[in-house]
Structures are given as C-alpha cells and as structure tokens.
Amino acid sequence: MNSLKSLCLKCIVTLCLLVNAFAFDYASLQEQDENLLAACPQYITIYTNGPVPGTTTIYPTSNVASNTSENYPYTGSKSLSSSSILSNSTISTSSSTPITASVPTSSSILSNSTIPTTSPVPTTSSTPTSSSILSNSTIPSSSSISASTITTTIISGSTQFTTTFVDQSIDTVEVVIPTAGYITTTLTSGSSYPVSTTTLQTVSGTQSGLVEVITPSCGCNPENSFHLRLVGDSINPSYVYKNTNVSDPDEGNMYTSTEGNTEAVNVFYYDPTVERILTCDCVRPVYTIYTDDPDSSFDIIKNNNGTFTFVESSSGEIQTLHVSQYGALWITSPEYDGETGGMDDVGFRADDVILVAY
C-alpha cells in the first residue's frame, strides 16, 4: 500500500489509542477516547495547613483549576438517630466508664414485640428474655440503647476511604469529620506519572478551620522530560515544536524549528503505556494519518538509545521521516519512497531523518 502521511500534533487532551487499520473511523475513535480516558485527569488532593496534628481536615467534592489552591471554611457535625445503631454494642462514655447494653434480638423476644429507642439508657439495665416477655408485649423504655460505634464511608473526588467514628450521646451520635487517626490520600497526575502518597493526621472533636485543596497539574520533571531533535535535517540543530497556527489540520502541526529559532521548542515526555509522546502541558499528541491513505495507521516505538521508530500497524513496515521545505514532519512508507517522482513531488528538504529524544 503506497502511503504518504503527515505527522499531526493537535492541541487537545484526548487519549490517542492505536488505530485498527481495518476499521479506521477517526471521528468515532476520538469520541470514544473522550468518553473513556482523558489525557489529564484531575485528582483532588487534600492538604492541611501544614499538615500538622490538630488541624481539622475535610474532604470537599469541589475541584479547582490546575496550579491553584483554595481555602474552604468548615464547621459542623453530623447526627445519626439511635435507630441506625447496630445491636449488641458497647458504649463508651466521656468518663471512660463502659456501659454494656444488649439489645434483644429475634431469638430472645417473642414475635410482635416492639423495642423503643428514644429514652435515655440507665447505668444498669437488664435485658428482657423470652421467658419474661409475653406475646404482643412492649419492652419497657428502660431497655433502650444509646449511641455506639459508627462506621462511615466518606467519598471525596477520586479518593475513597473508610474510617470509624466513636462518640457517646443519649439518643444521637455525633459524627465528626474527620476523627482521630491517620488518613492516607493518593495523588495522581497523568497516566504514567509515579504515584506518590501523603499522610494527614487529624484530631477528634468538632473544630473549625481551613482546608487547602490542591489539584496537581501535568508537568515534566528532569527524569522523564526531553526535547525532540531531528538528526539528518538540512538545518542543524533542528528541534521539534508545535505550530498552533496551522490552518489546515490535515497538513499537521508538528514542525521543526528554523535556523536560529529555538524559542518555540517544546518539552515532551514519553508514555510507555501507550507508546506515545506527550507534552508537559498535559497535551497528548494525536498522530493522524494523511488523507491520501485513511485506512492505515502506525505505532511509535521508543528505542533504548532515545530514538523513535515509526511502524505501520497493518504491515509492520518501518516508516521513514522527512522534512518538507516549510519544516513540517512527514512519514512515508517504503513503497512511496520507491515510487518514481514521488519524493520529488513533495519537495522534501531532508529525507530519512531520525527523531531523537535528548
């Protein structure tokens, strides 16, 4: 299959998956990418003002823009009725004196019995058994039970954690968000960035305070970032950058810098999970094929020496890179390279160049 393809780097944040060469539908693929995976998902990360013990931390569901932070005031508690308390609980009072109250279960109470849960619990109580309660009877209010241990799951943004709250009251449970203990929050940025964690410590009791919500943004670091340089171009040195002023998207917008112009050189990083090059500003390059050959696709493989190889998916043939007179990058198949006049028609300024990460 003779093919001539241009390398297009569109400034969008959709994930570019490998294209099926026999069922290529770019519009559907792009829509599918937008629905399934975004190039720059935002995960909310919660920090206290420190973080230090004694600072109240809450987990709001609000999000903020990248590279910004915002303070959220918070004061409050949550009440749960005693009817939601599990049976056979041990209640801890503020004086640390345990009061054990066993709620009668179906095995110890005859049918049609009613257990009220609205009256205070005495310091001592005896649990009615099946031998002391007649059918259709009502259990005295002195056998009511008060608050106990509550387990609550809090969901905030992309973080889900479970923590246990313990408190004592007459017929309500005060749930403080958060309670004593450690909460581990995982922050993630991009699809292949190393995952890092931070541990926040908070204290029990209802408090007022501020919480700082920080949303990490995509970005490169010295370990994973690089420039793209072309070896073999007629202009030396020759770097790769994005030309956002291209009017025709089919012509591509991945260009090489002209002589003496290095200000527009972009910084990239390589995502090995999808074998694609991404920019550090959270833009995943979308490599499109030239419209002369809409049924083919190609893979990009990063070699151990930092160079990149372009392989056509349908045939497994290694593609070659060329630079046009205007500095645009082109990919051609071996068949096209062998055609008489094919290369001359385009007028490349450099043939068989190599894309190198450095």
Curated annotation (Swiss-Prot):
Biological role: May be involved in agglutination during conjugation or other aspects of colony formation. Induces flocculation when overexpressed.
Gene: pfl7
GO-annotated cellular components: external side of cell wall
Subcellular compartments: Cell surface
Protein name (record): Putative cell-type specific agglutination protein pfl7
InterPro entries per record: DIPSY, S_pombe_Mam3/Map4
Signal peptide limits: 1-23
Similarity section: Belongs to the mam3/map4 family.
Domain DIPSY: residue ranges: 207-358
